[in-house]
């Protein structure tokens, strides 16, 4: 698959493009149109893609699931870019949790009201 961005670089490259779309013409860019519509439109898309991912996961077609997961990741990255949350912050949080029991990590989280 010549010409593809190496997997380790894909998220960062995509994030940079999503940042650039903040100043793009909403008539020419799907992402710019989401930014113009605001957070609620982005959150709605994430919800739709999450539901579609769940439906795809119930079926044996792994390729369909991969496509839905890509849609979900993409729209989550749109939200991250809108909020200026760099992917390194999320991977840093995952690294912080790595090697810790899920039960122990959850118990150590600050309680919210």
Please place each PLM-identified region on the residue numbering.
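Flexible "arm" and connector segments at domain edges
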Residues: 1-69, 73-113
């Amino acid at each position: 698959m010549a010409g593809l961005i190496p997997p380790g670089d894909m998220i960062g490259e995509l994030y940079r493009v999503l940042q650039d779309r903040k100043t793009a013409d909403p008539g020419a860019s799907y992402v710019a149109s989401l930014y113009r519509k605001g957070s609620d439109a982005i959150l709605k898309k994430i919800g739709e893609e999450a539901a579609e991912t769940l439906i795809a996961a119930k079926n044996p077609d792994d390729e369909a699931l991969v496509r839905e997961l890509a849609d979900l990741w993409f729209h989550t990255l749109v939200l991250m870019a809108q909020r200026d949350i760099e992917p390194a912050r999320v991977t840093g949080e995952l690294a912080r949790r790595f090697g810790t029991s899920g039960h122990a990590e959850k118990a150590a989280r600050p309680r919210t009201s």
